[in-house]
Amino acid sequence: MDVLNVKVQKLNRDAILPVYASQGAACFDLHACLPDEAEVDHYDVGRINEGESRRATKEATVVGTGLAFEIPAGHVMLIFSRSGHGFKNQVRLSNCVGVIDSDYRGEVKVSLVSDNHKAQSKTLTVKHGDRIAQAMIVPLPAVQFEEVPVLSETDRGRGGFGSTGN
């Protein structure tokens, strides 16, 4: 297997370099780099009546990693929620998937929010060194778009949102 060399700059001496949790892990872990604890507030969804919009009453918490990456041209870093956060604490990335472009050189940060409105404390405390997300760096194909009057036919056609089965 070819290994992609990625340069990483510690913006904080206490930042933790990314590591893979196991030999077969698809993603590497990103760690919180915090001087103090941070609390991740929940979204209070309350009762939603027909015609009402769902409004967030708490804001997401941005947690820095203390790291900047030099992602090779033609690649992108994708940041995902950790599965344990979702299953155990209902914590997720507020933007679902983070996208770090190859020309970005600033600190990689993660925006976390908890949907656990049943929790007594309604917050999750994140401490320095906690694993806050997982990420992978993948090749990004160059794409050229071609406008056409008609697209080719498929069995699925225009069916979307559950049209392929349960």
Where are these regions (language model features)?
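Non-catalytic terminal segments and appended small domains
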Residues: 1-166
